[in-house]
Amino acid sequence: MKNLLIICDNFPPQSGPRMGYLVKYAKRLGWNSYVVAAENKSRNDLTGLSGYAVETYVVPQRRHRKWNLLHILHFFWPYDYLRGEYEIRRIASEIVQRVKIDLVLCTHTYGWFPLSAAYAVAKKANIPLIVDIRDLVEQNPKIPFFEMSFNQKMDFLRDKCSFLSNRRAVRMHRDAAALTSISPWHAEWLKRWNRNSFCIYNGFDPELFKPIEPVKSNQFEIVYAGSLATKRQRNPELLLEAIVQLDRSGVISPEMFTLNFYGEPSGSHVLPAARALGIERYLKFFPSVPITNLPEIFAKASVLLLLGARPSDFRTHGVMTTKFYEYFASRRPILLVPDDEECLGQVIRESGAGWAVRTVEDTVSCLTTLLEQWKATGVVSGNTMDGDRYDLFSRETQASQFVEIFDKILNGTMVPGQIFNGTDKIEGD
C-alpha cells in the first residue's frame, strides 16, 4: 500500500465530500490516506464517509474578534493563523516523520488555505505535492464595487492588498507536481500556472444514487432539489414564463402539472416571481429532505430541474453543481433553465442527459414534447447513455482518476501540458 497525506480545509462528516470519497475509494486501489483538516462547522451529514482514513486530525479554528490585529495582518500575509494553519503544519510534519508518505495532496477553495502548510511540509520532506483547486476567484463575474455586498467588498480589498500572498500562491501552484480541478474551464485556466493541470469532475455516490425505473403518475411533476440561492444565480424566469404560455393555451392545469421545490420551504425569490405572473398555484415548496430520500423523489419525477443564471446577468465559469451529478445518476431527464452556455450545458447535451434551453420558446417546445410523451405513457423516458459515459461521473471513477495521476507522478510518466478532461485517458510517453 502507498500512503497519501491529505491536507484540507474541510473533511467528513461535516463537509468535504470530494476528499471523503477519494479516501474511501483510493483505499481499494492501493492507497492509504492520512488526513489533517481544518475544523468546519457545516451541518452536512457525511458520517457515511468517516472511518476510511488511517488517521484523521481536525484542527479547531481560533476564536477571535473580527477586526483584531491578526485579522488585519491576514490581508497581507499568506499564513492563515486564525484558521490553525501553523497547527496543521505541525501535525502534518509529525506524520511525515513517522510514516513513509508517497504524496501530499492539498485541496482548497478561495484564499488558498491551507496551501501554505501543505507546501511547506512537502518541500521540507521532498515529497511531490498535488494541489486540488475547487474554486477560483476568476470563475466569478466581475461585479461593480458599489454593487458588492460588504463581505464581497472585503474579499475584493483583501485580494488587492495581499500581494505577498498572491505572488507566493502562484509560485506554490507552479512548483506542484500537478494541479487538479472540477471542470475543463478550471483546468484550462490553471495551465497558466502549471502545465500539468487536469480536470477531475465531482460526481455521485454510486452506492446511493443508481439508475431509477420511472414511476407512472397522474401528474406531470418537475422536481428541483437544493438551494435557490439568489435570482442572479438561479433565475426561474424562462421556466415561469413558459408555464404562463402553457397555462393560457390550455395545455396544462394545476391538477395534472406541478413544479415542486425541495429545500426552500419559504419559496425564496421564486414564489414572488410566480405570484407576479399569476401561476403560483402550480408551485409547491417543501423543506430539505435527507439525501437518502432523494432517489425515491427522483423516481416519481417526470423531469429534474436545474436552474442556472442568464449568462448576461451572472457570467460564471466552470461551475458544475453537485446536484447535476445526483440527477445524472438517476437517469431521469434533466432540464437546465437557462443554458449556462458553458460546461454544464455542454455536458448535458453531449451526454444525452437532457436539455439546456436558452429562450422561452425553447422551454415551451421542450415541455410540450415531454408532456405529449407523459400523456401517452404515464412516464417520461430517461436518457439512454452508454455505461462508460454514465460511469464517468461516479465518485469511484473520480478516485480512480486521482490515483492514475498519483501513479503517473511516482512513475515519472506524466505528460506535461496534457489535460485530462474526464473522457480521455492520461497516456504515458
Regions found by a protein language model. Name each.
Residues M256-F257, G263, S268-P295:
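Nucleotide-activated donor-binding/catalytic signature segment of Leloir-type glycosyltransferases, i.e.
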Residues F204-Q219:
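Acidic anion/phosphate-binding donor-loop and adjacent secondary structure
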Residues I182-W185, G203:
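Carbohydrate-associated surface elements
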Residues F113, A120-K124, V137-Q139, Q152-L179:
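Membrane-proximal helix-turn-helix segments that form the acceptor-binding/catalytic region
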Residues R358-V364, K375-N411:
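A charged, aromatic-enriched C-terminal amphipathic alpha-helix characteristic of glycosyltransferases
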Residues V215-P236, L240-E241, Q398:
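Conserved donor-binding/catalytic core segment of Leloir-type glycosyltransferases
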Residues M1-P60, A178, T413-V415, F420, ...:
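N-terminal subdomain of nucleotide-sugar transferases
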Residues A177, F298-H317:
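Acidic donor-binding loop of glycosyltransferase active sites
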